[in-house]
Amino acid sequence: MTLLQPHRARLVEQALRAVPADAVEGVVVGDGRTILERTEGGFDRVMVDAPCTGLGALRRRPESRWRREPADVPALARLQRELLGAALDATRPGGLVAYVTCSPHLAETRLVVDDVLAGRSDVERADAASAVRSVALEEPGLVPGTDVQLWPHVHGTDAMHLTLLRRTR
């Protein structure tokens, strides 16, 4: 995983302490669009925690509504597509990429994924709902086989999006 912000990398490292040490290659600070070029097709799992508008976290950070404006969305979506494409390139055949945002905005979630997939024949969607169910403490009420969109009023979380993609070749 690559991150430009060292403080976010530290948060990810803390979260990964719950995972067996031999299951994690590491957290790298850098630009995910280019840093992964050195490892093309080498990772089993990659998580893209994409920079986004943060609209899904408004309940916890109401002041963030003043940090973004609608004109920011196209540039963020372009960056998200670049990061997702680079992550897929860095993943070996059979490996998984998790694309995650804390935004429910379609331009930052499904449309980004759909756009990237339209240009690739080596990737398929995986069942994100089953993956979430396998680690959930209680039944989250998700539709099987789909991307996952969590909502504050339904799931008691931020509005987060997850798509799982499998590299087929």
Segments (PLM) and residue ranges:
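S-adenosylmethionine
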Residues: M1-R169
